Amino acid sequence: MADSTTGTIENLALVMANLSHSIEELKATIASLNSTIDSLKAENECEPKLLEDISYTRTKKKQKGKIDIKLDNLKHVKKVYDIDEKDRVCDECGSKLSYVGEEFVRHEVIYEPAKLYVKDIYRKTYECRNCRKKGKAVMLKAGTPQPVVPHSYTSPSVLSQVIIDKYVNHMPLYRQKSEWKRLGMELSRTNMANWIIIAAKEYFIPLVNRMHELMMKESHIHCDETPVQVLNEPGKKVTSKSYMWVYSSIKESKRPVKIFDYRPDRKATNPQEFLKGFDGTIITDGYYGYNHIDGVTNAYCWAHARRKFYDALPVDMKNASDTLANTAVEKIARLFAIEKQIETLSPDKKVKVRQEKSKPLVDDFFSWYKDNQNKVLTASKTGKTIQYALNYEAGLRSFLEDGLVPMTNSLDERTIRPFTVGRKNWLFSTSTKGAEASAAVFSLIETAKSNKLNPYDYIEFILDYLPQQDLVEDPERLDWFLPWSEEIKEKFEIKAD
């Protein structure tokens, strides 16, 4: 009996020990997740306690009436309610009432469900009866617009909706198939995918190529990349990674442009080929693929460096205050606080402030690093991060000398975000042609948005009018369709409230 009791106690002790170990593992996991959350928050805001000596006042913008802001851009239809003539009688004396005016009561937004109809296209034909009498057939047929996709029943409006639903609303083609069926049209995923590929080849890619030519004349370009899976990539496994490279002009550019460039790998030759002939500054996260491009100046992202230090913080954030990683985060936060103060200044004034306020902090940052480099293990997270910062010191200092260089590459990261959100829904591209088409579509849509255009209206206009142009005879006509052209902005710019 005693042996049995002893065995039971030992088993319970073992169970408790295992549970205790599991609890500690869970605590570590939670702490790690909390650390990650803190890191993500820090990408967009500085630590409040670090701003005491570098403060600024933000003037709260007075809000307009919310209803006006939401409804100003919609068509308004006036509906007036009247009293039946037989009821226009005074309740007091029975006399006939006289009209004195009307009053506004409220707004109501009316939703009209989408609907389809078929436009049956005919053309008239004429003949010369006089020539006919002489045995000669002379006939004249009315011209008709070229179809957006030859030998297809799609239209610019339908194809634009397919494109916007996939690339703006992140709706996969299989879900769109159900929506089109609900509207009364059987439409296969294969048809929709082929339409997008044809439209990209015939209309979008020529525009993007022209945008690329003009981008090479910019002074600064943001660069970034993100993985994408392509199922039928020649010579590669289905599970292998391909990449979507993204290049953006800086926010000060007079011609805002975003270009997505699909490539089968992450080799350095990809940005080298895309940026051939560019001799300005590229803003990147420090990926080595951007570091060997002839003729360019490299500016590196401080947010990326800060993220590395956050990752180097101990799992238990309570013990982080005395660590080198935490000190680095605090030093970087002071730099970001200065940037927040000067974000609306001209480039020249930014450089002046950066030289006066930011440069001493940057000098201190790297001097402090070099002094502490030997206090941590080279193979540790903090050691690797210190080495990263020292290796990229020149590029991290670039913003001090150039007012057009931002401290971060966040603009390009925001440009990529719609692609990454869409990728979670449609998961992969079936073919390289599909991936290239997606790159062209994203380029036009994100550039349109950067130029404050309505993406649907702009895409529909391209699909409606570009098929009617003879670009062989008049190649310069292509510039008329670029998102920043005066004609396009006049037609499709979303007006500010």
What is the role of each PLM region?
Residues 1-153, 193, 222-223, 284, ...:
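Short, flexible loop/hinge motifs at secondary-structure junctions
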Residues 2, 38, 125-127, 132-497:
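Catalytic center-proximal scaffold of phosphoryl-transfer enzymes
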